[in-house]
Amino acid sequence: CVFCTRLTKPVVQGYNLKLDREPTAKEVWESIDDPKKYDEVVFCGFGEPTLRLDVIKEVAKKIKDSGGRVRLNTNGHGNVINKRNILPELSGLIDEVSVSLNADSSEAYDEICQPLPMFRNGIYEKIKEFIEEAKKHLPEVQASIVTHQRGVDETRCKDIAGKDFGVKYRARRYNIVG
């Protein structure tokens, strides 16, 4: 995305988020320790967490079995990436999904989020389908945008979330954690 500094400066709120390698499910779980210490454990990242769906499912199950709450922050490409509807697999594991809508049209999305060429001209509709499908499988669904993006009608984004899909809406400033 045009607003992301993942490749140039992978730091958010003073935390360097660059990893030398992807952690195993075991390493992720061990780093959490007791999930009840946290309000929630969030699968999020500089990239798309559902690229590692197996890790999400394995760790989320342990978190839920230990009494924790789980949120997934996603770009909504998970069904396309995994070539199947992944949402039924997340039922009972994910308490809330936050889908990065980030635009009010397909054209604006392609310009701002710069999806891979094979996903352009159509991925925005797949994201909206993901939001609609998520409502069938997960208890809480929200659509979010990064605010102050040129050419994006933030009021229309709020309407897409609330009026079109009946989900929560979250406008967030980039580089603000929480």
Label each PLM-derived region with a short phrase.
Residues 1-24:
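Canonical Radical SAM [4Fe-4S] cluster-binding loop centered on the CxxxCxxC motif
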Residues 22-23, 27, 33-36:
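N-terminal pre-catalytic segment of deacetylase/amide-hydrolase enzymes
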Residues 29-33, 46-178:
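Conserved AdoMet/S-adenosylmethionine-binding subsite of the radical SAM
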Residues 38-48:
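Active-site groove signature of glycoside hydrolases
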